[in-house]
């Protein structure tokens, strides 16, 4: 297996590894080194090789340079190891898509190749670099995507929206399996919403709205803060709690809260481990996913959505394709992506109608139960087994 990310911190490769090891696989893993973990180690029976490269943080040139070094390194390692023992399978995680190059020698010697496309690179590039679909780099990403998919025996992706995109421009739909990023049931135990929620909310000390995740512009913390400023006019006890690693964008948003006079109602509480997030979600009244609308968020199905629902909490999410493929207005509170006024309206509805949103959360849990990790893991193992057989 190869991934341009750190192990065991990137959850999707980690859980794929756990699933395959549980099914009896022996795994050699090539991944990024974070400067702290050893370059080589045997961890839980997995042979781990870490390449000492930092994840790129700047422009396209740095991305291309670091990707190139990593692809060359992993390709050479897999080629040399293939001389000593033949691989049955090479499992490649994007980004980049052309990391599949590292599997060329094992494939020539008979190995099957699985390409796990976490994100469509053209859409992500459009979002990160604010370029149009006709941009030359975006067109190149589409060509590389098609070329990379052609090298794979099986493509795995994260939701129906991504499957539609890949099948529309790169391969037949039958080649693509959907394995969603569902919460770990061992960490996020299933909890039902209150059975007898009141029809109306009595005055409370506070009404806690929660945001957790990456604090970048596309994820819409600014939308949540603008909405909170409106909500405070009729729900004075409303409070927004923010969790995630600090960023310059967060600092800018805290200044915005200060300028709006709601700084005491926007609490930044830092990053949390998954186990700690369970406790924090348990303390909130409502989760929000306040995304802006762009090429990437339009097709994204946030794992955070399922994390709230697993713990019985109502959640407001944008009415984008990656979400409406699975949920309708009976099972989720929707707002128009990027629209702070609409988000404020839905938060107010949630506050004043506790019984109704409890029922909506309950129906949302029915959707979540169709996509628990136990089910998604089984899909993964069945499709990989089908390729090998």
Can you say where each PLM-predicted feature lies in the sequence?
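N-terminal subdomain of nucleotide-sugar transferases
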Residues: 1-47, 231
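Membrane-proximal helix-turn-helix segments that form the acceptor-binding/catalytic region
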Residues: 79, 101, 105-109, 121, ...
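Conserved donor-binding/catalytic core segment of Leloir-type glycosyltransferases
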Residues: 156, 201-228, 241, 361
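Carbohydrate-associated surface elements
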Residues: 161, 182
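Nucleotide-activated donor-binding/catalytic signature segment of Leloir-type glycosyltransferases, i.e.
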Residues: 251-278
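Conserved acidic donor-binding segment of nucleotide-sugar-dependent glycosyltransferases
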Residues: 329-340, 349-355
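A short, well-ordered alpha-helix in the C-terminal region of glycosyltransferases
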Residues: 349, 356-370
């Amino acid at each position: 297996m190869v991934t341009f990310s750190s192990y065991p911190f990137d959850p999707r490769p980690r859980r794929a590894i756990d699933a395959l090891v549980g099914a009896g696989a022996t795994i050699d893993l090539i991944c990024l080194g974070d400067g702290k973990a050893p370059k080589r180690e045997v961890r839980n029976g997995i042979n781990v090789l870490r390449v000492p490269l930092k994840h790129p943080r700047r422009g396209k040139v740095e991305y291309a340079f670091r990707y190139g070094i990593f692809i060359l390194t992993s390709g050479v390692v897999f080629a040399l190891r293939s001389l000593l023992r033949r691989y049955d399978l090479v499992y490649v995680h994007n980004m980049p898509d052309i990391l599949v190059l590292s599997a060329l020698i094992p494939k020539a010697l008979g190995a099957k190749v699985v390409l796990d496309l976490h994100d469509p690179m053209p859409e992500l590039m459009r979002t990160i670099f604010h370029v149009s679909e006709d941009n030359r780099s975006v067109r190149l990403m589409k060509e590389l995507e098609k070329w990379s998919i052609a090298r794979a025996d099986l493509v795995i992706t994260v939701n129906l929206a991504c499957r539609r995109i890949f099948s529309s421009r790169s391969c037949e739909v039958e080649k693509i399996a959907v394995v969603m990023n569902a919460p770990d049931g061992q960490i996020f135990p299933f909890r039902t919403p209150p059975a007898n929620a009141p029809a109306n909310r009595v005055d409370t000390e506070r009404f806690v709205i929660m945001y957790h995740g990456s604090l970048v512009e596309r994820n819409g913390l600014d939308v949540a803060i603008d909405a909170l400023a409106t909500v405070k006019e009729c729900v004075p006890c409303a409070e927004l709690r923010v969790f995630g690693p600090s960023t310059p964008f967060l600092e800018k948003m805290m200044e915005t809260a200060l300028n709006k006079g709601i700084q005491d109602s926007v609490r930044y509480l830092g990053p949390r481990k998954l186990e700690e997030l369970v406790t924090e979600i348990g303390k909130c009244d409502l989760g929000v996913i306040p995304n802006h609308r762009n090429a990437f968020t339009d097709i994204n199905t946030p794992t955070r959505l399922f994390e709230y629902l697993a713990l019985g909490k109502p959640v407001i999410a944008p009415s984008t394709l990656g979400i409406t493929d699975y949920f309708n207005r009976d099972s989720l509170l929707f707002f128009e992506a990027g629209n702070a006024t609409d988000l404020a309206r839905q938060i107010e509805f949630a506050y004043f109608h506790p019984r109704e949103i409890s029922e909506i959360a309950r129906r949302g849990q029915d959707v979540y139960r169709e996509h628990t990790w136990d089910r998604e893991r089984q899909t993964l193992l069945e499709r990989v087994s089908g390729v090998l057989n």
